[in-house]
């Protein structure tokens, strides 16, 4: 996969592409080869990311990091083909780079790549987007597990969620059979125990919540600020928008000294059965 072909395939904005290419042309990628090779391997990706950061030096807009990661993504294409993973999953997975650039632009008005600390998961082929949801192969409670992530552009209807879960089960059974029977879990503001009182039972969020057995409450977590309001976690409540009913309700909580927080839950076995996923 050529870099230009990849960027066209994931819809990378032209201004971001030009910035990234300018930084890439100034880099000596051969000096980064060791770190880039380790970035592509699940066991060494996290450490390699930190080492690569140090090697790249000053990188205020993180376009050097973006260029290195996208070069690795180009190499991933052959690995996808060797495993029999479709082009659809490849491009859907790697569109995370475009999505994150867009989220940062919306939040700050700048073209900055601020998610390199996350996207090494896609680079190392431990996280895939299958339909509307993302699935990360990891460990949970000492065992192999699948962490479910909800992209900001996901169609969150119950039908699409169920379709994604079914396809993920089929994908794992075929491509990564060691994870076919793994437990599915999710850690998100969408699973906050306090969210249920703010939403109608007919809402997509409530229908997503009831798929999980909530096992941990994180009342101090504030990551929801970005997803609900598009703001940084330390933004004063007075400055938060009130364009949606959820924004208004959560803002009222903050005004009253409360916090939405987050929760962690395990996908209920009966729902896994209904989705066609295998059981232990």
Regions found by a protein language model. Name each.
Residues 152-161, 190-194:
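Short acidic, S/G/P-rich loop/turn micro-motifs used as interaction or catalytic elements
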Residues 183-185, 192:
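Extended, charge-biased low-complexity segments
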């Amino acid at each position: 996969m050529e870099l230009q072909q990849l960027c066209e395939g994931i819809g990378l904005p032209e201004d971001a592409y030009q910035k990234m290419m300018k930084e890439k042309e100034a880099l000596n990628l051969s000096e980064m080869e060791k770190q880039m090779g380790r970035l592509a391997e699940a066991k060494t990706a996290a450490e390699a990311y930190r080492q690569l950061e140090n090697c790249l030096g000053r990188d205020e807009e993180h376009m050097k990091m973006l260029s290195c990661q996208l070069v690795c993504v180009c190499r991933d294409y052959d690995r996808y083909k060797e495993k029999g993973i479709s082009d659809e999953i490849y491009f859907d997975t790697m569109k995370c780079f475009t999505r994150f650039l867009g989220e940062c632009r919306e939040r700050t008005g700048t073209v900055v790549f601020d998610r390199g600390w996350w996207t090494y998961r896609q680079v190392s082929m431990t996280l895939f987007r299958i339909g509307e949801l993302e699935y990360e192969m990891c460990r949970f409670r000492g065992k192999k597990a699948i962490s479910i992530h909800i992209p900001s552009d996901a169609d969150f209807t119950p039908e699409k969620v169920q379709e994604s879960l079914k396809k993920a089960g089929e994908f794992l059974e075929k491509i990564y059979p060691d994870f076919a029977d793994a437990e599915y879990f999710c850690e998100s503001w969408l699973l906050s125990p306090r969210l249920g009182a703010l939403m109608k039972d007919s809402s997509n969020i409530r229908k997503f919540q009831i798929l999980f057995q909530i096992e941990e409450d994180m009342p101090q977590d504030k990551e929801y600020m970005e997803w609900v309001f598009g703001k940084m976690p330390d933004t004063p409540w007075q400055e938060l928008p009130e364009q949606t009913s959820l924004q208004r309700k959560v803002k009222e909580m903050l005004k009253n000294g409360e916090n939405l927080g987050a929760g962690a839950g395990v996908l209920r076995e009966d729902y896994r059965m209904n989705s066609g996923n295998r059981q232990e």
